[in-house]
């Protein structure tokens, strides 16, 4: 008899102050895919050096929306840093998209960016360059080693909270003040 598999899809990982990996220090990552082969997610609180306007220009997509052009593109993680990922909240699905949770999708399709540029795309979307990846069992080990806290994803945290507030606010959803935690452990 096999054990039921727990999926971490649609969970936010919140890096604890003791996180040893600088890619994820004070990071918040949305887990988009998780199975026996590993996990994939997108870091939600690291700005890249690019705006969405610059990315759209490189793709040959024009937009009249100043707000869209000024939107910060996230540094989604160290894996595939030249590849774009779009997390969006919508009833409509653009191109091939992966359902993360209730109306929340991930896509690498250019279609959603073109629709956003035309004003017909999802009203709430995050664009990231790169993603985070974990080998089979790696993320589970990191959880056991107390590198991460976990909370269910929340659309308001993803789309309505400023980047610099996401780390503390995500932990606050489960009553944790990250600034009161130490970054070392001891043995009794």
Swiss-Prot record:
GO cellular component: cytosol
Stored Pfam families: DUF179
Signal peptide as annotated in the record: none
Database matches in Gene3D superfamilies: VC0467-like
InterPro entries: AlgH-like
Organism: Xylella fastidiosa (strain Temecula1 / ATCC 700964)
Entry protein name: UPF0301 protein PD_1276
Recorded family membership: Belongs to the UPF0301 (AlgH) family.
């Amino acid at each position: 008899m096999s054990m039921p598999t727990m999926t971490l899809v649609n969970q936010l990982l919140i890096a604890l102050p003791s996180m040893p990996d600088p890619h994820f220090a004070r990071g918040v990552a949305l887990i988009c895919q998780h199975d026996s082969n590993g996990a994939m997610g997108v870091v939600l609180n690291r700005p890249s050096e690019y705006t969405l306007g610059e990315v759209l220009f490189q793709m040959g997509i024009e937009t009249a929306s100043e707000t869209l052009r000024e939107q910060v593109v996230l540094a989604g993680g160290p894996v595939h840093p030249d590849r774009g990922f779009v997390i969006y909240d919508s009833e409509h699905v653009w191109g091939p998209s992966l359902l993360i949770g209730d109306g929340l999708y991930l896509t690498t399709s250019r279609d959603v960016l073109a629709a956003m540029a035309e004003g017909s795309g999802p009203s709430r979307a995050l664009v990231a360059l790169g993603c985070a990846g974990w080998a089979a069992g790696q993320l589970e080990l990191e959880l056991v080693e107390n590198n991460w806290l976990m909370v269910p994803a929340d659309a308001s945290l993803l789309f309505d909270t400023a980047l610099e507030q996401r780390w503390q606010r995500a932990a606050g959803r489960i009553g944790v003040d990250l600034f009161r935690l130490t970054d070392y452990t001891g043995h009794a």
